[in-house]
Amino acid sequence: MGCSTGRTVERDKINNNGYPVCRLSIPLQMEVGSLSALDKNKLILGAKEELQCFDILSKSITPISNEHKGRINCIIKLSNGNIATGSQDNTIKIWDIDKKEVLYTLNGHTSIIWDIRELEGNKIISASDDNISKVWEFNEKKKEYESYDLCNSHRHISSVAVLKNNKVILATGKNLFLYDLKTKKQESFLDIPKGGVWVVRELSNGDVAVGLGNGLLYILKITDELIVKTKFPQGHKRTINNIIELDNHKLVTSSDEKDLILWDPNEPESMYLIKGHEDIITCLCFISGTKFASVSRDKTLKIWE
């Protein structure tokens, strides 16, 4: 079911009973640690400290910049078309990709940036290994920014999920914290003693998917409290490091293993193993519809649909 590696491979478009099929496999020259879709035909890659653009149609990779001085851990596309990147050099950069220019370099964290998410009103929120989550606000006319600390935890903050009611969930060690962005106060928390939490992602129905260090996947229902709505059966054996939602509401997860898993929240007892990579999967991104991309330490980028 997977594509072979080491050369460019395209597969004919069998629907495979609705399960993802590898449509394209591209060999990479560098290890890629982060990935985001710019549009349905272009991906932005974080290849160590270099930002690159991959054109799916031409199957070509173009360097953008190596402004970061450390590995790029996270990339997101902002609603205004710009790109935000977080790095092991402790900085966040905002990019105009068309001009290949850095618009802002955000200084304030004292350790690795693990995650970035966009907020309403020209803001982003970051999660860092310095145990702090910061909110950053931009003044585009003055080309300035301000920031404040939302949470100062006792452990590193690895991930952020942004909810529709002006609230966020922070993943820190074995705890999940619910914060109100208006009051800047913690409203609730959930202790997950076994495995700890690495990644949280908001879903289109308002729930939140949680990936644990022991390979388990949870779905949370968010009220005034954080309530575990669904516990999926054991699929991964190692830390879940990425979660994406497809337009059909199914979830795809990757872990410190070489296989992906497709999950259906409506049928939590079922799972589908997606094989094709030969080494640990480092990053995963949604493209459009049921199309997504993955990158592995086997130095291949694969497009699935």
What are these regions (language model features)?
Residues 10-30:
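A short helix->beta-strand "capping" segment at the edge of beta-propeller domains
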Residues 21-26, 60-65, 101-106, 143-150, ...:
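A short beta-strand motif characteristic of beta-propeller blades
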Residues 25-49:
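Beta-strand-rich domains and repeat architectures in extracellular enzymes and scaffolds
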Residues 25-32, 65-72, 106-113, 150-157, ...:
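WD40/WD-repeat beta-propeller blade N-cap
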Residues 43-46, 83-87, 124-128, 168-172, ...:
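Conserved beta-strand element within WD40/beta-propeller blades
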Residues 49-52, 70-73, 89-93, 111-114, ...:
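Short coil/turn segments within WD40 beta-propeller repeats
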Residues 56-59, 97-100, 138-141, 181-184, ...:
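Short loop/turn segments that connect beta-strands within beta-propeller blades
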